[in-house]
Amino acid sequence: LEMAGFDHAALVELEPAACATLRLNRPAWNVIEDDLRRFDGRPYQGIDLVAGGVPCPPFSKAGKQLGAKDERDLFPEAIRLVDECRPQAVMLENVRGLLDAVFDDYRNKVEKQLKKLGYVPGWRLLNASDYGVSQLRPRVVFVGIRKDLAAGFSWPEPLKTEPPTVGELLHDLMAANGWRGADRWREQASTIAPTLVGGSRSTAGQTSARLAQNAPGPPWARRIRSVLRSMSLLVPPAEPYSCW
C-alpha cells in the first residue's frame, strides 16, 4: 500500500512483536497496539481505504473451517469499521479456503452487508507469482468500492513475464559474505518459493522449522539452531560465510 502511494492514518495490530517491527521500520506511522474489537473507527471518517488481513484460521483448510462460529472471525469487525470510517474503498485478504462452497452463505452475507452500506463488492483468487513476486502465494482478495466510484475499478491482469527464481533474486545476498557455495545454491534454487506455513503464537511454523533444520552451517551453528527450534525462537539466519 505504501508503494501504491497510500499514507497510513492508523495501523491496528494485537501482536507486540509485529507492532515493534512496524515502529522500528516506520517510526512516523501511527501504530496502535490493541485488539481490533476495541478500535473506534469514527475519528477516521472519510479516509480513502480500509485494508487488512483478518485472521485466516476460521476459513483455512488446515483448520476446522468454523467460519462465523470461530471466535477469531473478524470480518464482522472489518464491516463495522467500514461503517464507522465510510472510506472510498475496502480491501481484505484471506486464504483460498474462503471461496469453498461451505462458505457461500458467509460470503453472500458479507456482500449483502457491504451493499447495504453503499459499496459494490467482489471476490477474486489472486496469486502473488502472477504479479512478479517470487513465491507461490494464492490469496482471496475482497474488494468493496463505493457505489459512485465502482465504475472506475478493474481487477489487475496477470503479468505476461515469469517472476525471478529464488536463486536469481537472492544470490547477491547469499554471496555477500564470500560463501563459496552461493553459485551452486543459485542453481539449485531454480524455482519460486513455496507458500510458507505459519505457526501458532507459541510454536514455530512447519516450513520455518524445516528450513532451519536443513540450513547449512558448522556443528555449533546447527546446535544453536536446534536449541532455538526447541524454544520456538526461530529467527532467519544471516548470510552464510565462506567457512560454510
Regions found by a protein language model. Give the residues of each.
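Class I S-adenosyl-L-methionine
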Residues: 39-49, 54-226, 231, 241
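Conserved SAM-binding loop
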Residues: 22
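Conserved SAM-binding loop of SAM-dependent methyltransferases across substrates and taxa
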Residues: 1-4
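Short alpha-helical
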Residues: 16-17, 105
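Conserved SAM-binding strand-loop segment of SAM-dependent methyltransferases
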Residues: 28-35
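Short beta-strand element of Class I
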Residues: 8-9
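Conserved acidic E/D residue at the C-terminus of a beta-strand in Rossmann-like folds
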Residues: 12-16, 93-94
